[in-house]
Amino acid sequence: MPTVDDVLEQVGEFGWFQKRTFLFLCLISAILAPIYLGIVFLGFTPDHRCRSPGVDELSQRCGWSPEEELNYTVPGLGATDGAFVRQCMRYEVDWNQSSLGCVDPLASLAPNRSHLPLGPCQHGWVYDTPGSSIVTEFNLVCADAWKVDLFQSCVNLGFFLGSLGVGYIADRFGRKLCLLLTTLINAVSGVLTAVAPDYTSMLLFRLLQGLVSKGSWMSGYTLITEFVGSGYRRTVAILYQVAFSVGLVALSGVAYAIPNWRWLQLTVSLPTFLCLFYYWCVPESPRWLLSQKRNTDAVKIMDNIAQKNGKLPPADLKMLSLDEDVTEKLSPSLADLFRTPNLRKHTFILMFLWFTCSVLYQGLILHMGATGGNVYLDFFYSSLVEFPAAFVILVTIDRVGRIYPMAASNLAAGVASVILIFVPQDLHWLTIVLSCVGRMGATIVLQMICLVNAELYPTFVRNLGVMVCSALCDVGGIITPFMVFRLMEVWQPLPLIVFGVLGLLAGGMTLLLPETKGVALPETIEDAENLRRKAKPKESKIYLQVQTSELKGP
């Protein structure tokens, strides 16, 4: 009986139907970009100072320039460690009193300004920006600055929680239904975020968007890889992730054109509604239909693929079946990932690598956005490096292998982070170059580890292994905003030190993994244990006691 791959070899592994469907689904990948990294613009924190009643009137009466107003009324100017004082403290002075002159008005109150009492901001802040962000609208600065971190962490928390439930929905009710449902919720929650009346409701809508957006991306990823033949699956998977990079590049331009965070959020959310047209444009996965014993529907879709590709369907198409062993199946458990020495080692290393690449990727972007410069151009330049990163993967993955390029990329990200510590502020171009090098390294690792993770586990625990290890990616995303912004308050280079240590450790630990280039996917525990060495004699094979499907109810 022919399998889906057998039929695709005859009707086209990547014909007109697959190309059209791929382009449709790439919109889902691009839409994830502003959800994942839109915080750079939505949560942009401009320079700010306390609003003091009477200062505007005095400045207008005296005809001060903006520089003179700052010099006369804001504490902490010129001090190397005066950022907090300048942005979060104010002189406890009544600026409405008539005795204040126009030239150094505070001189009449104290011979030295350092003797004047300071107090926290009580009347809001003045922001030096023509646009708006969630920071300027909800005053998320000083004591409330951590709320910006929480805003971003909620997205990653949603990714973490949603990927578990959405995966079940996709397997139980179908890829297409899961894609449409998550897309609808994603679009609605994005619009609700844009019109949220307060910080709390905005946070809840953002969490809801995180719960479904990554699941929507994963559903699109699964659909397109199940529509193409095995020879194109890896390339299509990488190019699907390139669409995410296209979304990042577009985001920098849209954010520049729309400096108001509410209109920006609305603009990047509305295109998601277009994906609802997938109901008519994208069919269900024939592989999933076969797994649900809906063979007639699967045959109709394969026949449609043949027609769209201009090919004749095979004569035995009606006998289409899944290419899988229908005999006894093993039921994996979490303990199986740690039960044997090599599986245990691989699991711990992969979990650390997923965590590290998430911290480096997101952390370098957030750090660059928080350290001055033109945030739009900096984000644009660093997004462009993701395209050569994809090219490097396509060129090296079957020529050089997986492990050495991945280790080198981790090391490059770590070294670039360490060098950034010593770059003077006036060499901003060098800061951008090093940030781009680090981001390129993290991008390569983030895309390659998906493949390596699957290739190191035996068949019956492969999906579980990928799910458990990749969950650390979302855990890294949850803590990264706090790691970047709060550590910068302690000492600005401190996040870069953490990034450097993580990158160097990850580079070394990657070399402890076996190379999987040209190696068949392990089917058994013994295969996974012996990836580095020749098979042992039969009597020394490792067996695991696992449950079988017979032990479960119908």
Swiss-Prot record:
It comes from the Eukaryota. Phosphorylation of the transporter leads to changes in its substrate affinity, resulting in a regulation of the transport activity. In contrast with rat ortholog, ASP uptake is inhibited by protein kinase A (PKA) and C (PKC) activation. ASP uptake is also endogenously activated by calmodulin, the calmodulin-dependent kinase II and LCK tyrosine kinase. Inhibited by cGMP, most likely through a cGMP-binding protein that interacts with OCT1. Residues 1-21, 171-176, 230-237, 284-347, 396-402, 453-464, 514-554 are cytoplasmic. Expressed in kidney, liver and intestine. It is a multi-pass membrane protein. PROSITE patterns: MFS, SUGAR_TRANSPORT_1. The keyword Phosphoprotein applies. A motif (Proline-rich sequence) lies at residues 283-287. SUPFAM superfamilies: MFS general substrate transporter. Residues 43-149, 198-206, 259-262, 369-374, 424-431, 486-492 are extracellular. Pfam families: Sugar_tr (PF00083). One of its GO terms (molecular function) is acetylcholine transmembrane transporter activity. Keywords: Cell membrane, Glycoprotein, Ion transport, Membrane, Phosphoprotein, Transmembrane, Transmembrane helix, Transport. Phosphorylated. A large substrate binding region with partially overlapping binding domains for structurally different substrates is formed by several transmembrane helix domains (TMH) including TMH 2, 4, 10 and 11, and it is alternatingly exposed to the extracellular or intracellular side during substrate transport. Electrogenic voltage-dependent transporter that mediates the transport of a variety of organic cations such as endogenous bioactive amines, cationic drugs and xenobiotics. Functions as a pH- and Na(+)-independent, bidirectional transporter. Cation cellular uptake or release is driven by the electrochemical potential (i.e. membrane potential and concentration gradient) and substrate selectivity. Hydrophobicity is a major requirement for recognition in polyvalent substrates and inhibitors. Involved in the uptake of clinically used drugs including diabete treatment medicine metformin, neurotoxins 1-methyl-4-phenylpyridinium (MPP(+)) and iobenguane and platinum-based drug cisplatin. Also involved in metformin efflux transport. Metformin competitively inhibits OCT1-mediated thiamine uptake, leading to a decrease in hepatic steatosis. Plays a role in the anticancer activity of cisplatin and may contribute to antitumor specificity. PANTHER family: SOLUTE CARRIER FAMILY 22 MEMBER. Belongs to the major facilitator (TC 2.A.1) superfamily. Organic cation transporter (TC 2.A.1.19) family. This is Solute carrier family 22 member 1. It comes from Oryctolagus cuniculus. The gene is SLC22A1.
